[in-house]
Every structure is written in C-alpha cells, then in structure tokens.
A protein has these predicted regions:
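Beta-strand-centric surfaces of beta-sandwich/beta-rich domains
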Residues: 1-354
Length: 354
C-alpha cells in the first residue's frame, strides 16, 4: 500500500551569517537576496519566519540616544518579496519595515510578539527574535486560498536589508559587533492543496510625513484595480507610537462611505475596532485598524476599488517644536483568483427519457 504524502511541513529553507561584520559605531545597510524557488518547489506557504539569533558584543562607555525604532527588530530596515511572473502588478511583500511586519503580525495573532530591548551599554547580549510573513489569513473563510503557491512562479526573490547600531541609537561612541548573529528562514507549508482558487495579494507599506494640522490629509497613493482587505495605520512621534497624531479617518469611494469625515472617530477605531482584534491587555497606543478582513473572514466585504479608486483622508494634528510626526500605512490588497482561477464546473449530463 502506497503511503500518503505529508500534507504539511515546517522546514528551514536557508540560513546565512548576519551581513555586517566588525565593531562599528554605525555601518552601511547590507542587503541579502534569497531565491526561494531554489529551496521550495511544491509548497503553498502559509507563512515565512525569519529568525535572527546569536550574540551582540557592545564595547565602550559612550551610550547613544534611542532612535525610537523597535529594538532590536528595527535592525531590519526593509523586506521585499518579488515574483516572476508578476501577477496583476502585485509584489507579495512590498517594502515592509520591521515595524510594519511586527504590528501586522500583532493584528494577525492577536498579541504582540516582541523581543527584549538591547541596551547601548558594554557587554555581550544574547538575542533571538523573529519576523513573520503571513500569507494564509487566519480567521478567514477558505484561508488556503491566500497561501503563496510557489510553483506558480519561476522566481520568488526575498530581499532582506539589515543595519546595525545606527538603526537603534544615535550619537554616542559605543561600538556594536553584530557578526555573531545568524539568520534563518523557515517555511510553514501545505502540500497537495485542493483550492478552488488562489488569490493574488500584496502586503505593502507606505509612509506619510505629517507637517501641519490638516482636516483632510490625503492618502492618495492607493491605485484602483484591487480589493483593499486590510489597512493598519501606525502613528509616530519621533519614531515612537503615539495617539496624538490622528483624530479621524474618512474612507469613501464610488458613492460609498465606510468611515465618514467629521466624526472624530480615531479614538473609537482604536478602542473598539482595533481592540476587538486583539487579546485582552494589548497596548494600542498609536495603532489603528479601521479595515480588517479578520472581522468577517470574507474578501467580499473588503473595500472595493476594482473599478473605481477610493479616497482616504485623515484629520491630523501637526507636530510641535522638536517633534517629527509620521503615519505609516501597512495594508493588504488583492485580486481574487488571479494566481489560480477556479475551474469551470462541468454541467451534469442530461438524462434521456425513453
């Protein structure tokens, strides 16, 4: 009797040493490209997990000032996953920062997965943290339709760009030696998937500097041709998450209104819409999820911009002296069934009567 093949796998695809060597006060960013099709050919990725672990050696007595970025996750500057062919103009992971990955995963899991902070003081610090790239959408109907079907692509290039101390601390004279770190890429995969369809979907990030108080600040970089299933806004004051930046969300398009202007709805979006996606006790300062497929599990309930553009405007407060405000949009857009369309159903044969 032939054995049934494994229908899932959790496997290390690739590993490499951290790309920055030597003791440095600051270092130039270094990118590492990884062609995933060399290590997986039949997988339907539910998620990828990038693990960074090892020792950071810190020397000196001149500590710097924290930049406000997530520590230590902020050592990742940018992640991108590009495919060939590029389906419906989608880049599956489009220029995500460490913060974008961290808080997208918070919404997906229901809690923040965060490592301990690395101080800028002399010593050897053992570290171990993860970046999660979610494809399959938990709490959705037919979640397998959102997996990343690698066999549909001739190339799937994951590029990770890393930095060193300068990402987490400014000023000071201490040196960091991060050459003792290693990076591993794991895949949580399914096999022999019998899905009606596979969607083309993108996880993207865009940044909007807030320079002054404005009641209709435009988020005008969202093209039509897609369903927008998720919008996570992260408001920042000097790189630190803050609830003092956004007062209202206005989301409209084609005569439809999802969130209205003039409602001063940011607080309720944060305290109700966002909090309901998370476990009890999670901090939501500066975190707003007005749009999430996880609420009802159906892409048919998403923000529809397939044929007409949508308009997103924010009511924002401008920064005071010595402050830099920024709004980070971490979003998901998709085209249903674009990677694999459902096969047409064959009509049942007509029975002949005598």
């Amino acid at each position: 009797m032939a054995s049934v093949r494994n229908l899932w796998r959790y496997k290390k695809l690739y590993s490499f040493p951290y790309p920055i060597g030597g003791a440095n006060v600051s270092a130039s960013p270094q990118s590492v490209p990884v062609e995933l099709t060399k290590y997986a050919q039949e997988d339907f990725f539910n998620r990828l997990v990038v693990r960074v672990f090892g020792n950071i050696i810190i020397a000196g007595s001149g500590s710097g000032t924290a930049t406000g970025r997530d520590n230590p996750e902020g050592l990742l500057i940018q992640a991108q996953l590009q495919t060939s062919p590029q389906v419906t103009g989608v880049t599956p992971v489009n220029r995500l920062s460490a913060r974008g990955l961290l808080y997208e995963n918070m919404i997906t899991r229901g809690y923040l997965l965060k490592a301990s902070t690395v101080p800028d003081t002399a010593g050897t610090v053992a570290v171990d943290w993860h970046y999660i790239f979610n494809f399959s959408r938990s709490r959705t109907r037919k979640r397998v339709e959102y997996t990343f079907a690698i066999q549909k692509f001739t190339s799937a290039l994951l590029t990770l760009t890393f930095g060193s101390r300068e990402q987490l601390f400014s000023g000071g004279t201490n040196t960091w030696d991060v050459s003792g770190l290693s990076v591993e890429i794991y895949a949580d995969s399914a096999f022999a998937v019998q899905a009606d369809q596979i969607h083309s979907h993108e996880l993207f990030e865009q940044n909007y500097p807030i320079l002054s108080t404005q009641s209709d600040f435009p988020i005008d970089t969202l093209p039509s041709g897609y369903l927008y299933t998720d919008m996570l806004f992260l408001a920042e004051d000097n790189n630190v998450l803050s609830s003092a930046v956004i007062q209202n969300f206005d989301l409209e398009g084609g005569g439809r209104v999802w969130l209205a202007s003039g409602d001063n709805n940011a607080a309720i979006v944060q305290e109700d819409f966002t909090q309901e996606l998370l476990e009890t006790g999670q901090t939501v300062t500066g975190i707003y999820a007005p749009v999430s497929i996880l609420r009802n599990g159906m892409f048919t309930q998403a923000i529809d911009a397939l044929t007409a553009p949508i308009t997103v405007k924010l009511s924002v407060t401008g920064p005071g002296l010595g402050h830099v405000f920024n709004v980070r949009l971490v979003g998901r857009r998709m085209v249903p069934g674009a990677v694999q369309k459902a096969a047409p159903k064959t009509p049942a044969p007509v029975k002949k009567t005598a």
